Design a protein with these regions (language model features):
Chain B
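Conserved acidic segment of CheY-like receiver
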Residues: 5-26, 58
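Acidic, metal-coordinating helix/loop segments flanking the phosphotransfer/catalytic sites
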Residues: 36-57
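Active-site residues of response regulator receiver
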Residues: 60-61, 91
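Receiver (REC) domain active-site loop signature in two-component systems and cognate sites
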Residues: 64-65
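Short, glycine/charged-rich "phosphate-handling" switch motifs in NTP-dependent
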Residues: 108
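A Lys-centered signature of the CheY-like receiver
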Residues: 113
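CheY-like receiver
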Residues: 119, 124-125, 129-149
């Protein structure tokens, strides 16, 4: 179906979208990971920092104890011993904190264990120093030894603390380095990925807006064309309906409702409503046709009547065709025509035709009466007169013989009249069978029909070549007989008649007033004679039935011959004209279509 | 030349025409036996009666009461022992339709009733003296309607 525009971009658009979404998902997962790493590293730094602080606290507590002890030893003032007494608790607190902080680190635990041992030894050394510095138990050598030992222990503790700090620092450094490596990889990559995603989105945005523009254009066109269709439906008195065979849904056009005499969309159509307004006479046949659609997938013309809600009967013609739309669903497209006007006109025409046929029949029976019943008594009059023998006439009076002659000529004239009238009516009523024949042949037939009078008058007939035309042969032959016969009859008494017949092809446009313009070419056949001619003022009237220019005593005739000619030419959609100069001759011109 | 008298039968309802016909046969110098029937029914009865001698030539009027000439023609041509009778249609009408119909039904010649007694004699003479075997074999639509030279 061509009328649905094809938006090819929709598939590629989908792909672009999916890619862009995946890129964005990827980017956000990377960002999340970064965040996690950052969090981890800050926690790690905090951890190291805390261990460091606790170790420093431990150190300073021991140092405080050392300083307090020294002050006491020198001054023997018990106030100097206060930091020493508290330092033990401080050391323990820090120690517990450190134990917790290094719980996940085995080497540090071991270090801490060693440190604890060293610190315990240091406090033992403190006790010893206090003991040997006491004046009661004073021992200079032992005091010096313990003081010195304490100093070494102190060095060891400091060393151990530094070692632990170093381990933490190294560990921190290592971890930070790993995070750094992870993070340093990404910025360029993620920026470029982001740019790719962005450009994809921009691209699809452009495509979408372009499609949107096209859609707008098509939408406008669709609106216009649907408007035009519904307009033309109401002008043309037709309507459309669509039957989706898959979903069994039926849609009526607005005009369908109007044709049914209803407001548009006044009910939801379905298979049953298709039949609802159909005239009871036609319901069965329409239902059959509808069933036929489903089988044959096609609906030939169906003619039926419908009854509108106001009981007005309208005549409908319906046809349909099965179409498959772009989505592959099968839709039966139906068209209804309201043919009421045509139907009524048709009925009227049929009636007129019947009347015409009747009057034609009457005419034919009149012909029969004329040809048979009127001729019968006439023939008998003539035969009986012919039976009056010469011997009978001998014994008759002069006047009696005269009357017999007059009866004879009247009867003869009656016969000619009847024959001519019959001929005239037959040019109308007999079947008109057009056959392609040579006019030359018909003309020579006409000449042989007139051979007697031609010989008698010593007439000369000159004929140029005549064409082959599609004509009613016996009528054209009659036409030639009448025209030549006419020329022979009205020849000049002392001059041998000369008739020349010529033919040429002419364009109908050259004779706009007399020729049928829908036919382009005509054959113009001219009959020229040197007869007595007639007054040109009669050139129209001589073709009228029973019109005579001469008295019947001078020139016997019925006044039908030329009327027959006119009729014959008209039967051929041609034209005949006459012209003449009195005393010089006449020209009869016949136009016959090519 | 005929050895025996020709048997002629005229089927015509018109008394005057039968009279003309009879007179004409009397005046021509050919030995003939002329008999008459007045309508189509009588004609068929006559022909079907085995006591009657079959005519050599049957002159058949078309416009007859009870049974028309055309009906008789069809019936005769359908009947085995009658179909070889020479049939001359003898009618006032000269309509194309009648001529065409009777030709198709197998009549041998079509005569339009003349309006002159001498012409009638000439026609009868012509029809009676024609060699029908020869004429029938060369019969066509053009020479079916009798035209006197």
């Amino acid at each position: 179906m061509k009328w649905i525009p094809n938006f090819n971009s929709s598939n590629s658009l989908r792909v672009i979208f999916v890619i862009a979404v995946f890129i964005l998902l990827f980017l956000s997962s990377i960002a999340y990971k970064h965040n996690q790493d950052l969090n981890e590293s800050s926690k790690l730094v905090m951890h190291t920092y805390e261990i460091n602080i606790q170790l420093e606290r431990l150190m300073s507590a021991i140092k405080d104890a050392e300083t307090g002890q020294r002050g006491y030893i020198i001054t023997r003032n018990a106030r100097f011993l206060t930091p020493y007494i508290y330092s033990r608790d401080k050391v323990n607190t820090s120690f517990i904190a450190l134990k917790k902080l290094t719980a996940d680190n085995k080497p540090q635990q071991e270090n801490l264990q060693k440190l604890f041992k060293l610190i315990t030894q240091r406090f033992v050394s403190f006790e010893n120093c206090l003991k040997y510095s006491d004046p009661k138990t004073y021992d200079k050598r032992k005091l010096d030894n313990h003081m010195f030992g304490g100093r070494i222990l102190m060095e060891n503790i400091r060393f151990k603390v530094d070692e632990m700090n170093d381990i933490e620092k190294t560990y921190l450094k290592k971890r930070l380095k790993i995070y750094d490596a992870e993070i340093s990889l990404s910025p360029l990559f993620s920026v470029s990925l982001f740019l790719v995603a962005l450009s994809f989105i921009l691209l699809s945005y452009r495509q979408i807006s372009r499609d949107f523009e096209r859609l707008k254009v098509f939408n406008k066109k669709l609106l216009i064309s649907s408007g035009l269709i519904s307009e033309s439906e109401s002008i043309g008195k037709f309507s459309t309906w669509q039957w989706d065979l898959d979903s069994d849904k039926i849609d009526f056009s607005d005009n369908q409702f109007r044709l049914l005499g209803l407001e548009p969309k006044s009910f939801a159509p379905n298979k049953a409503t298709l039949l609802k307004y159909v005239h009871p006479d036609d319901k069965e046949s329409v239902a059959k046709a509808i069933d036929g659609i489903v089988d044959k997938k096609d609906l030939p013309f169906v003619y039926y009547k419908i009854v509108r809600p106001d009981f007005e009967v309208r005549y409908f013609k319906t046809t349909g065709k099965l179409v498959t739309d772009q989505q592959g669903s099968k839709i039966l497209l139906g068209i209804n025509f309201d043919i009421t006007d045509e139907h009524l006109l048709n009925i009227e025409l049929q009636e007129r035709n019947k009347e015409l046929e009747k009057s034609n029949k009457e005419l034919a029976s009149f012909n029969h009466v004329a040809s048979h019943d009127l001729q019968e008594p006439l023939r008998k009059i003539q035969t009986f007169i012919s039976r009056v023998s010469d011997a009978d006439k001998e014994v008759m009076s002069e006047s009696g013989k005269n009357y017999i002659t007059k009866i004879e000529s009247s009867a003869k004239r009656m016969r000619v009249l009847i024959d001519d009238l019959l001929l005239f009516s037959r040019t109308n009523t007999t079947k008109k069978e057009f056959i392609k024949v040579s006019l030359s042949e018909l003309l020579s037939n006409a000449e042989s029909e007139l051979a007697e009078i031609i010989e008698e008058k010593k007439a000369v007939i000159r004929v140029s070549k005549l064409p082959k035309l599609s004509v009613i042969p016996y009528q054209v032959e009659q036409l030639f007989i009448n025209l030549i016969g006419n020329s022979l009859k009205y020849s000049q008494p002392d001059i041998e008649p000369e008739i020349s017949i010529s033919c040429e092809k002419v364009n109908s446009s050259d004779y706009p007033e007399i020729l049928e313009q829908s036919i382009k070419k005509f054959h113009k056949i001219t009959f020229t004679d040197n007869g007595m001619g007639f007054d040109p003022q009669f050139k129209e009237t001589i073709f009228i039935l029973f019109q005579r220019l001469h008295s019947k005593t001078d020139y016997p005739g019925t006044g039908i011959g030329l009327a027959i000619c006119k009729k014959i030419v008209e039967n051929h959609k041609g034209h005949i004209i006459a012209d003449s100069t009195l005393g010089k001759g006449s020209i009869f011109t016949v136009f016959l279509p090519d | 030349m005929q050895k025996n008298a020709l048997h002629i039968l005229l089927a015509d309802d018109d008394e005057d025409d039968r009279l003309f016909f009879k007179d004409a046969f009397e005046e021509i110098k050919i030995q003939t036996n002329v008999s008459f029937v007045h309508d189509g029914m009588q004609l068929m009865d006559h022909l079907m009666n085995p006591d009657n001698k079959l005519p050599d030539i049957l002159f058949l009027d078309l416009n007859m009461p009870k049974k028309t000439g055309k009906e008789c023609l069809i019936e005769i041509k359908k009947t085995d022992h009658l179909k070889d009778i020479i049939i001359a249609i003898y009618s006032t009408s000269s309509s194309e339709e009648d001529i065409e119909d009777t030709f198709i039904q197998g009549a041998n010649i079509y005569i339009k009733k003349p309006s002159d007694f001498n012409t009638l004699k000439k026609i009868i003479n012509e029809v009676v003296t024609v060699n029908w075997h020869y004429h029938t074999s060369g019969l066509n639509r053009d020479n079916f309607l009798l035209r006197l030279k």
